[in-house]
Regions:
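C-terminal "cap" of GNAT-fold acetyltransferases
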Residues: 40-56
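Short, structured motif recognition centered on aromatic/hydrophobic residues
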Residues: 9-16, 26, 50, 62-70, ...
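A short, sequence-level motif marking secondary-structure junctions
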Residues: 72-75, 146-148
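Short loop/beta submotifs within extracellular cysteine-rich repeat domains
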Residues: 22, 33, 58, 63-67, ...
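Long, hydrophobic N-terminal alpha-helical segment
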Residues: 1-45, 77
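Vicinal oxygen chelate
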Residues: 2-4, 17-23, 48-50, 58-62, 73-148
Length: 148
């Protein structure tokens, strides 16, 4: 039997025009606080990670998932173009993997197109890679290997 490639639902990425306003809405509505606030120039976003689950549990912990709020640094970034075409909302779904390089090789072997052929830097020190939404029911999918 082959072990499942995906270890958990890691996060839902949500594109927003105003990161501060989105953070305030999630705090006031759901009581969620910011776990991490970063600017990722490679991906062209300012982002906030909000933990959903047991208080005090760290990245990669079972039972903890995240909401990742993404504000584009400019209109010509992937998230900026997404908002221009579709408006604010769900941008992608991220799944945890134990070994991102192995996961990419396995997925590529099935014929699924890779957006990223090699892992790159993600939130909170994770290694990440995206899979093409055209091969996955229209869902942009992110593989996430949390920082150990």
């Amino acid at each position: 039997m082959v072990l499942p490639l995906l270890t958990r639902l890691d996060h839902v990425g949500i594109a927003c025009r105003d990161l501060r306003r989105a953070i305030d809405m999630y705090r006031e509505t759901f009581g969620l606080g910011v776990l991490s606030l970063e600017e990722n120039e490679e991906q062209g976003v300012r982002e906030a990670m909000l933990a959903v689950g047991p208080a005090g549990a760290g990245p990669g912990s079972l039972g903890v998932g995240y909401i990742q709020l993404l504000e584009p640094l400019s209109p010509d970034t992937p998230v900026g173009r997404f908002i221009a075409r579709r408006g604010e909302g769900i941008h992608h779904v991220g799944y945890g993997v134990a070994d991102i390089k192995e996961a990419l090789a396995t997925v590529a072997g099935t014929g699924i197109r890779l957006v990223d052929e090699r892992p790159r830097h993600g939130s909170m020190g994770a290694s990440i890679a995206f899979l093409h939404p055209g091969d996955l029911g229209g869902v942009l999918t992110e593989l996430v290997q949390p920082l150990s």
